[in-house]
Amino acid sequence: MVRSRSNSVKKDLKRKVDEPVDVQDEFDVEGLIDEGDSDDEDEAEQEVAQENVTKDKKNTSKTENEEDADDESDSDAELEALIGEEEDLSGSELEDELAYFSDAGDDEVDPSILKHLDDGVRLRSLSRSSDQTDELKDVVEIVPGADGKPRMIKKEIHAVYDSDDSDQEESNTIGNVPLSAYDQMPHIGYDINGKRIMRPATGSALDNLLETIDLPEGWTGLLDKSTGKGLNISKEELELIKRIQKNETTDDASNPYEDLVEWFSSKTEIMPLSAAPEPKRRFIPSKHEAKRVMKMVQAIRQGKLLTKPKEDPDARPNYDVWADNLTDVQDHVMTLRAPKMPPPTHDESYNPPAEYLPTEEEIAEWNALAPSERERNYVPKKYTALRHVPGYSESVRERFERSLDLYLAPRVRKNKLNIDPDSLIPDLPSPKDLMPFPIRCATTYKGHKGKVRAISVDPSGEFLATGGDDGTLRVWEVLTGRELYRCRLVASIDAQDDSVECVQWNPAVPGMLAASAGEHIFLIVPPTLFDFDIENTGREKIEQGWGFAEGGREQQDIDTKGLDDDADSDSDDETGHVKKKSPPAKWITPTAKQQASGIGAIITATKTIKRLAWHRKGDYLVTVAPSAQHRAVAIHQISKHSSQSPFNKSKGIVQDAMFHPFRPHLYVATQRYVRIYDLAKQVMAKKLMPGARWVSSLDIHPRGDNVILSSFDKRLLWHDLDLSDKPYKTLRYHEKAVRHAAFHKGGLPLFCSASDDGNINIFHGTVYDDMMTNPLLVPLKVLKGHDVKSGLGILRVEWHPREAWLFSAAADGTAKLWTT
């Protein structure tokens, strides 16, 4: 019995060994255990193995036919008998049977196993390529074992999002391969052991019809891709689906309607739930609450926390019948509603009164105006009935402009500044305490035809010299306004381009004055005005220069290398010789007629002279010709009849130039900047940046530390040289361009500005000896009296040498004296 059982076990094991051979054509097995055998031995072994496989197939087919023919009852009986026989086996016999089929070792195959397996199956080792070895390293890790032999340990599998966490095992392991790939094959996939899963048999059309009529239990009409059969659901799954559809709980164990258990009932118990003693904090005042209460008390005392006023229940509420609806919700404090459009007026009515209807002249005038200049966008019309009123054509445009107004003009809430207006006004002394200063016109000097452009007072203060567009130079008596001297400097009256631009009395040589007309500068000693000694001194001062020039002495120019760092070195020609610079002006002897009128010398420049100023010693004269480029500024010496240009390169259009009252400095004002040059050190000492667009004139304080500038952009700028290169004060009191500004040279703290608006502004300016105290500027008076002609007002102002008197020259052809 035992031997028959062992034989049956052998057959079963042999059948299990033979099963993988059926699919030998689907696997590529490479390499054998005996790698050193020759090719002939391999071929012989393959032939023997093929014969054994054929025999096994025949035996297997016979066995299967016999098993199919057996009855089910006989199979059950044999199975019970077989189970009983296995239980009767002793332990030693069972161990012998198991040892018979066990391996002899890990590395070698026992030859006895190959001998007993008469089917000729040979064990083969799988030899792997380099690519397969790399893939194997990603899955397993080879480490040395305890016996010193290599041991393969599989790496830990990390669950990711795509990992499957279901408990149901997949019978078909094709993965993501679609079932359509197996349409032409008899199987539909492979199981976990690599065996084919055969396609299930399909019924006929009649069977399918019967299935749709008599639906089996759990029928879904779906196809299971893993088995190819119909997918049916169980009763439990169907019940779960019904619960989900009814929004019920899926767990039968949970009851959402359990009975209420009153853990804490309304009945008062005698014994407490907890017998712990009361904590100390229950009967001691809280320190934190005391701090909060004190903060609230302080806030109430300071008025930050206000209590609600008590409402009188008997008081009757007052309502504003004209106010908006009180039940509306109040807007947020930061909400700003759009301003409402103005209500329509009487002229917008379809039947306005007659006085609101425009005349034909008014309609023509309205049509002639530009749309942006019209007061209203419609013309009032009258209709007999409202049904006759046509559609309003401007409605779309008005809505669009309304939208633009709301979009481009955002509403912003600004906090109101509670500032006392008096605190914004500087604390200045009263003008009455700063007397004297000019307040009225005392004398008017008439006689010029056209604009009066130049004005100057001699150092004695008795005579006034003026020049204008008529080309004449006139000398007036200050007190009486009588004309004492007249000299025509322009040959023809029709010469519109030439006019007397500047007139200046010599501060050191009495009786001598300089006047410019066009490109010429005239040195004049007016006859019959002064006594013989004064007149003779002035003529000798001019004539001694002719003798110096005739002596053949060379003129020594001022070294101007340091005045202009960017000077061009173009004075050398191609041969390397130094070119001799041509003088910026020529000295010409006047004719006999001109000498009879008092002209002692004529200086001819290259361009029109716009400004001239004397040095304090009276020997040097600086002139400005803006269109002469780098020769715009020229310095002329009277005693030597020499002229020189201190600059080799132009740094802007020069507007004015002056000597410092007592230092060897030259102030040059361009359109944007004022440069101060030190003539002794031959360097630029300072550069002022007034910030004006176009500087018109320049004047220096008698103390030499402050400068005022006038500009065409309606500003008067005060510069403190000890403070900064930026303006100390910017005064904007004029409505048009400021033409000229001047300090009082006689020691009075006064200065003024003249503008094209026809006004003269008088200011008080005190300069303190203390360097820590800023100058005090106080506006005093606005003098009005000149007329504006062709957009031009007052062109020039000049202070009296000693008195608080002011002289002005304007475009209306007159000069005026303003006194206290």
Swiss-Prot record:
Region feature Disordered, mapped onto this chain: 1-111, 545-585
Domain of life: Eukaryota
A GO CC term assigned to this protein in UniProt: PeBoW complex
SMART domains documented for this protein: BOP1NT, WD40
PROSITE patterns in the record: WD_REPEATS_1 (PS00678), WD_REPEATS_2 (PS50082), WD_REPEATS_REGION (PS50294)
Region called Required for interaction with YTM1, residue ranges: 395-431
WD repeat start-end pairs: 447-486, 495-535, 604-646, 649-687, 690-729, 733-773, 789-820
Pfam families the record matches: BOP1NT (PF08145), WD40 (PF00400)
Record key words, sorted: Nucleus, Repeat, Ribosome biogenesis, rRNA processing, WD repeat
Location(s) in or outside the cell: Nucleus, Nucleolus; Nucleus, Nucleoplasm
One example GO MF annotation: ribonucleoprotein complex binding
Biased composition (Basic and acidic residues): 9-19, 53-64, 551-564
HAMAP family the UniProt entry points to: BOP1
Function field: Component of the NOP7 complex, which is required for maturation of the 25S and 5.8S ribosomal RNAs and formation of the 60S ribosome.
Family per record: Belongs to the WD repeat BOP1/ERB1 family.
Subunit comment: Component of the NOP7 complex, composed of ERB1, NOP7 and YTM1. The complex is held together by ERB1, which interacts with NOP7 via its N-terminal domain and with YTM1 via a high-affinity interaction between the seven-bladed beta-propeller domains of the 2 proteins. The NOP7 complex associates with the 66S pre-ribosome.
Name under which the protein is recorded: Ribosome biogenesis protein ERB1
Source organism (scientific name): Yarrowia lipolytica (strain CLIB 122 / E 150) (Yeast)
Phylogenetic placement of the source organism: Eukaryota, Fungi, Dikarya, Ascomycota, Saccharomycotina
